[in-house]
Amino acid sequence: QTDVLWTFLGGAAAAGLFFWLEARRGERALLHLGLFRIPTFVGAVLLSFAGRIFSFGLLPFITLWLGGILHYSPLKTGLILLAQSLTMVIAAGLSGPLSGRISVRVLLAAGMFIVAAGLLLSSRVTAESGWPVLLPMLLMLGAGAGLTLPHLMDLAVSVVPARQAGAASGTANTFFPLGTAVGIALFGVLLNAILQHALPLPAL
């Protein structure tokens, strides 16, 4: 659609202008582009971004499915989704002691693998499924996020010069909510495409 295309082009132009202005500010820049020359920092930021896309991007649609399709009350929906939150808290608490015995890179890889496995389990969910089918996916998404996300900020800050630690922390923090927003958008586009293919136009 024309309006979507122009909005995208306008956003891309604004982003390009922002990066150009930041590059001109040098050490006074809000976003130090030089940080992206550090491979480990880039990897930590991208993992933060991807982790939030796949761990949290589905949550709004799961909420809509539980409430709109299965007609669960807000309280019951919240209790079901609490499984992911509690698992994430427990996994995050365990990830600290584990990092003393296992390489952080191994923990990050294991966490992302668990998230991927959880997403794979989502293929078992149908319109007729009940919440027990959803539970393994929520537990795995929570466990994977809990293992990875606590270490990514430390990793991003530890590999940059000390004077740029604040900028590195701010940049990495920016990619957390950005990943969630992009994840919601991506899964929303996917849902819309599936609905347009599966339902007749009058139903839409």
Question: Which ranges hold each PLM region?
Answer:
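12-transmembrane solute porter fold
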Residues: T2-G10, A14, R28-L199
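Alpha-helical transmembrane segments
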Residues: G16-F19
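Membrane-interface capping segments at transmembrane-helix boundaries
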Residues: L21-E27
